[in-house]
Amino acid sequence: MLPTVFIVSDGTGITAETFAHSILSQFDQKFRLVRVPFVDSLDKAYATVEKINEAAVHDGRRAIVFTTLVDSESNDIVKRSNALVLDMFQRFVEPLEQELELKSSHAMGRGHQNADTEEYKTRIEAINFSLAHDDGQSNRNLSEADVILVGVSRSGKTPTSLYLAMQYGVKAANYPLIPEDFERGKLPSALAPYSEKLFGLSIDPQRLSEIRNERRPGSKYAAPENCRYEINEAEAMMRREGIKWLSSTHKSIEEIATTILQEIRLDRQSY
């Protein structure tokens, strides 16, 4: 039976879940994750304890709890559950308070609130921009892009663009490289004025064929030889044009996005 892991937060739980994934990935073990967001009252804290204790009885072992509860009373309630409780705020905030000689705000959901802030508006604008400029569907206002991802179809451009927008507020457009571009031997004319904003994504041809076969099985588009041709041509074009690029084959979206930010020297706040 898989160990049960609870992600308990008084907000969305995104911070706690990200941290939990980073820690749990160090163990060669699968886990059953239970998300419990918006625990913003004592009643909800007691209800959460009931869930945790029920899981412990069912599993025959203590649950594991990652918590970012700010309210000390709610936190104390959860800590009385039959679980190993890993309190991120107590572990990190209290030492920082001592080091900085400052008292933290102890405000619930502080990391994911205030829809009227400039940071939030910047992120929404970036998401809208990336959606409008997905897969080369619009050349309008390309000059506003922070980065333009290029690569063959299904090389990871769309998810990377959206991740950059949602996580960092980056206006990321993406543009497909197609056989017609390879025949001409040069980039699409729409991209010519923005060469300094281009970043390329490549992928292992065999992996590309597998991905494309899920979409259009048995087609020329998904054939291994066609995928090899497109990848070879795309990489050759990126080398000729001096475009920095990486292979997305064995990299997570997070790793790809971080590399892009470093390579194009974009200084962005993580949300």
UniProtKB/Swiss-Prot annotation:
Residues that hold ADP according to the record: 151-158
Keywords: Kinase, Nucleotide-binding, Serine/threonine-protein kinase, Transferase
Highest taxon of the lineage: Bacteria
Enzyme class, spelled out: transferase
Keyword flag Magnesium: no
Reactions performed catalytically: [pyruvate, water dikinase] + ADP = [pyruvate, water dikinase]-phosphate + AMP + H(+); [pyruvate, water dikinase]-phosphate + phosphate + H(+) = [pyruvate, water dikinase] + diphosphate
Molecular function in Gene Ontology: ADP binding; ATP binding; phosphotransferase activity, phosphate group as acceptor; protein serine/threonine kinase activity
EC numbers on record: 2.7.11.33, 2.7.4.28
Biological function: Bifunctional serine/threonine kinase and phosphorylase involved in the regulation of the phosphoenolpyruvate synthase (PEPS) by catalyzing its phosphorylation/dephosphorylation.
Family named by the database record: Belongs to the pyruvate, phosphate/water dikinase regulatory protein family. PSRP subfamily.
Name used for this protein in its record: Putative phosphoenolpyruvate synthase regulatory protein
